[in-house]
A protein has these predicted regions:
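Active-site anion-handling motifs in enzyme catalytic cores
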Residues: 1-136
Length: 136
């Protein structure tokens, strides 16, 4: 509920629309427009066209980073360390929301060039490790 309220307040301040990606009936009851079970193309399109993604999902954080979309991450009750790790890797810890009264986090700059470089470097390292592990 706090994250939903934050999304509505942030959208009002920035004059944005809230669009939720829904996977169940309960998602329809929340505020804003809900896109239920979008196709892969629609799903990625929502990320690409978003002014900002507000999420407590590691995967949504990763999509935002890979697609160059502004985002705000919230640590969920579980699995928060994955989000913290990718934010640290990409130097985007400033995009972590720690208080629901912080509306300035959205204005903090993301060095998208650095993010892209760090992700490419990590991919290269991981592919090299995998090739060695498989003796290829």
């Amino acid at each position: 509920p706090q994250m939903d309220q934050y999304a509505e307040q942030l959208a009002q301040k920035k004059e944005w629309d809230v669009i939720r990606i829904g996977f169940g009936r309960s998602d329809r009851r929340k505020g804003g427009k809900c896109v239920m079970l979008p196709s892969v193309e629609k799903f990625l399109g929502l990320f690409c066209s978003a002014a900002c993604v507000l999420t407590d999902s590691f995967h949504a954080t990763a999509f935002s980073l890979n697609l160059g979309t502004d985002f705000i991450s919230v640590l969920p009750g579980r699995f928060g360390t994955r989000i913290e790790s990718i934010l640290k890797l990409t130097g985007t810890e400033n995009r972590l929301l720690t208080r629901y009264d912080d509306f300035e986090v959205v204005d903090k700059v993301i060095d998208k060039k650095r993010v892209k470089e760090m992700l490419e470097k990590k991919r290269t390292e991981d592919i090299q490790w995998l090739m060695q592990a498989l003796n290829v």
